């Protein structure tokens, strides 16, 4: 499989480089690096290509020789990892032609009349985006090396509009991959934004895909959707809502219910890891008294409310 080159996620606020980062997270060798450090490493490669600071030994004409070579890459001159500026990995390798004026032609079985031009955006239009660069053996950045956080510390900040959330899960028992994927994609994730009395505002988080990685873990990409309003049977304590920050809307014997995501996933045979250490406080079974559970009477989209009016494009109105 090739890394994504088109901006098919652009409509959802996802840049091409962010899509490439997600691709390496899913299909890479258990890469543990945040997007900021991944972008910093990409900019280093881009700047060196533009300045022509590559040594002759770096530019190998045969990409196959690069993938089969066992020699360790040399240290990059002038690079140092540190917090605030991002951790620049030690093992970066680039494969490109000696001219480096653009992408090399790729053999294809399609005829000229069958070729379809790629819908490239402004970011892909840069010549550096078209180069067949790659990072082999990205070192984990220091941003992952943090003490364990509690559930509400991890989801203390609401995701920005259009910003997806990536969850990393591990199965607790053997399961069929197709059934596991279908079950994960079918979950109704929501992100609690706040509320008052028995009214709760939440952001729908739709699973875009669920894939199994090479290290026998699962990754689920949650895409923010519409803001919804839920009417609860009982008004919960505001400090207790942190436990339901990321929840799954389920049907129970008492009706619709908001279940914390880690508890809902555990019932399906998954333990949540994400890319931040999760506090090991998930109970073995989610069983609380009816008065302590968030039972939902009705859920409607915020746009469907009579009093809701879309904001005017005119800032003076």
From Swiss-Prot:
InterPro entries: TEX19. The keyword Nucleotidyltransferase does not apply. Keywords: Cytoplasm, Differentiation, Meiosis, RNA-binding, Spermatogenesis. Its main location: cytoplasm. It is found in: Cytoplasm. Specifically expressed in somatic cells of male gonad lineage. GO terms for cellular component: cytoplasm; nucleus. The keyword Cytoplasm applies. One of its GO terms (molecular function) is piRNA binding. Residues 101-145 are annotated as: Important for interaction with piRNA. Residues 64-113 are annotated as: Disordered. It comes from the Eukaryota. Residues 64-75 have a biased composition (Acidic residues). Disruption phenotype: Males deficient for both for Tex19.1 and Tex19.2 have impaired spermatogenesis, small testes and are infertile. They show vacuolization and seminiferous epithelium degeneration as early as P16. They have defects in meiotic chromosome synapsis, persistence of DNA double-strand breaks during meiosis, lack of post-meiotic germ cell and up-regulation of MMERVK10C retrotransposon expression. Number of females double knockout for Tex19.1 and Tex19.2 surviving 2 weeks or more is reduced compared to males. Females display normal fertility. Surviving mutants do not present gross somatic abnormalities. GO terms for biological process: cell differentiation; male meiotic nuclear division; spermatogenesis. May be required during spermatogenesis, probably by participating in the repression of retrotransposable elements and prevent their mobilization. With its paralog, Tex19.1, collaborates with the Piwi-interacting RNA (piRNA) pathway, which mediates the repression of transposable elements during meiosis by forming complexes composed of piRNAs and Piwi proteins. Interacts with Piwi proteins and directly binds piRNAs, a class of 24 to 30 nucleotide RNAs that are generated by a Dicer-independent mechanism and are primarily derived from transposons and other repeated sequence elements. Interacts with UBR2. Interacts with piRNA-associated proteins DDX4, EDC4, MAEL, PIWIL1, PIWIL2, RANBP9 and TDRD6. PANTHER family: TESTIS-EXPRESSED PROTEIN 19, TESTIS-EXPRESSED PROTEIN 19.2. This is Testis-expressed protein 19.2. It comes from Mus musculus (Mouse).
């Amino acid at each position: 499989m090739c890394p994504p080159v088109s901006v098919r996620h652009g409509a959802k606020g996802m840049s091409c480089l962010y899509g490439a980062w997600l691709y390496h997270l899913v299909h890479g060798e258990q890469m543990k690096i945040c997007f900021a450090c991944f972008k910093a490493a990409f900019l280093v490669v881009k700047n060196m290509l533009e300045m022509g600071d590559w040594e002759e030994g770096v530019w190998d004409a045969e990409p196959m020789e690069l993938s089969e070579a066992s020699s360790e890459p040399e240290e990059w001159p002038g690079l140092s990892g540190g917090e605030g500026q991002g951790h620049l990995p030690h093992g970066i390798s680039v494969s490109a032609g000696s001219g480096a004026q653009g992408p090399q032609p790729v053999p294809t079985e399609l005829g000229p009349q069958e070729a379809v031009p790629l819908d490239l955006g402004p970011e892909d239009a840069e010549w550096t985006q078209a180069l067949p660069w790659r990072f082999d053996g990205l070192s984990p950045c220091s941003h992952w090396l943090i003490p364990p956080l509690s559930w509400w510390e991890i989801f203390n900040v609401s995701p920005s509009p259009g910003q997806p959330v990536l969850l990393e899960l591990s199965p607790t028992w053997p399961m069929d991959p197709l059934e596991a994927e279908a079950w994960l994609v079918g979950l109704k994730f929501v992100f609690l934004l706040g509320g008052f009395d028995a009214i709760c505002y939440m952001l729908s988080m739709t699973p875009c895909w669920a894939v199994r990685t090479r290290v026998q873990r699962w990754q689920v990409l949650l895409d923010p959707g519409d803001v919804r309003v839920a009417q609860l049977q009982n008004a919960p304590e505001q400090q207790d809502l942190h436990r339901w920050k990321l929840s799954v809307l389920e049907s129970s014997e008492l009706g619709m219910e908001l279940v914390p995501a880690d508890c809902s996933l555990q019932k399906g045979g998954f333990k949540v890891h994400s890319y931040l250490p999760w506090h090991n406080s998930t109970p073995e079974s989610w069983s609380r008294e009816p008065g302590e559970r968030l039972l939902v009477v009705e859920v409607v989209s915020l746009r469907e409310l009579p009093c809701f009016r879309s904001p005017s494009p005119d800032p003076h109105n």
